[in-house]
A protein has these predicted regions:
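Charged, glycine-rich intrinsically disordered N-terminal tails and low-complexity linkers that flank
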Residues: 1-64, 68
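Nucleic-acid nuclease catalytic cores
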Residues: 73-188
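C-terminal end-of-chain micro-motif
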Residues: 1, 189-190
Length: 190
């Protein structure tokens, strides 16, 4: 399978590729309106312009959070393409992936099923089977001022173990079907 590595993510267009953050859609129920809307986006027939203040803040703080880890050899924004699977890694070394997640500090951070699934596919796509979610709690002022310094006391590194069975038994069979449907421009059946 041909792999393409890029170090700069140049487009926010999510059509024609299946990303790691799409994993819950890949392994979920394909007979819903939500799936249909998502699949139309993948086929390039619908555009998702979802953005909110929390997403904007997370995107703006991502590199500062990674820099605050002070990890030598840290690469940012690596993109890996395997056929129709596209993995965008926030940060990585040759031995570990660092996936940044920001959250409102007033709430406790938990690794959701969606985040866990995304992490699994990032590890699969990259071949790097060690991953930390770097959770950073944002305070109210952080949403209004993206120039605030990173407070290391608000950083949490949470290990996510690689689950080969999930990838082989749940993810890859469905990814294969979706990849073929993307190439043919049709809807999948499972």
């Amino acid at each position: 399978m041909k792999e393409i590595y890029q170090t700069l993510i140049q487009s926010q267009d999510r059509s024609y590729y299946i990303g790691c953050s799409d994993t819950s859609m890949v392994v979920g129920n394909w007979k819903t309106k939500t799936f249909e809307k998502w699949w139309l986006e993948k086929l390039g027939l619908n555009k998702n312009k979802l953005s909110n203040e929390a997403m904007k803040a997370g995107n703006n703080y991502e590199h500062k959070i990674l820099d605050s880890l002070e990890i030598k050899e840290l690469e940012k924004d690596k993109q890996i393409i395997k056929d129709r699977l596209r993995a965008n890694l926030d940060g990585n070394t040759n031995a570990c992936i660092y996936e940044v997640k920001t959250y409102n500090i007033a709430k406790e951070f938990k690794v959701s099923k969606q985040y866990w699934r995304q992490a699994q596919v990032e590890m699969y796509a990259s071949g790097i089977h060690k991953l930390y979610i770097v959770a950073y709690g944002l305070q109210e002022d952080d949403y209004n001022n993206y120039f605030n310094e990173i407070d290391k006391n608000r950083l949490k590194l949470i290990n996510v173990d690689y689950d080969k069975k999930f990838i082989e038994n749940e993810y890859l069979p469905k990814l294969k079907v979706l990849t073929e449907c993307l190439k043919k421009g049709g809807f999948p059946e499972w």
